[in-house]
Amino acid sequence: MFARHVSLQLKPTMANEFPVTFEKEILPLLRKQKGFLDELLLVTPEKREVVAISLWETKEHAENYHREVYPQIEKIVNRFAEGIPTVKQFEPQYSTFHQPAFAAKV
């Protein structure tokens, strides 16, 4: 399993629209990607900061998505973001929700 962490600051006037756009425009693109497992969208109570965590079967799946589809998603996100979103990659070590993926490692 592999994870991507995208964080961004929302424009104040766009904060309420972003989760709706995420569900209608971004999530369908993610679901079509080979190796996509799950997405977690986190928004601060003030609705100014967003963290999106996507889980992938492999690092290669995440990298293919980043090369081939993320530029399209970035255009959508840029309508809502102040500044440039930050993208980080992680190797998940434990999850109570995705336990079977980690059991295979042991």
Task: Show where each model-derived region lies.
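Intrinsically disordered, low-complexity acidic/polar segments
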Residues: 15-17, 63, 96
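Short, surface-exposed ligand-recognition loops at beta-strand->loop->(often short) alpha-helix junctions
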Residues: 9-22
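Residues in and immediately flanking transmembrane alpha helices
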Residues: 51, 70-71, 104
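An amphipathic, aromatic/His-enriched active-site/gating alpha helix that lines ligand/cofactor pockets
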Residues: 24-25, 30-37, 55-89
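Short, well-ordered beta-strand segments in beta-rich or mixed alpha/beta enzyme
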Residues: 3-8, 38-66
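Glycine-rich beta-strand-turn "strand-cap" elements at beta-sheet edges
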Residues: 1-2, 8-11, 40-47, 75-106
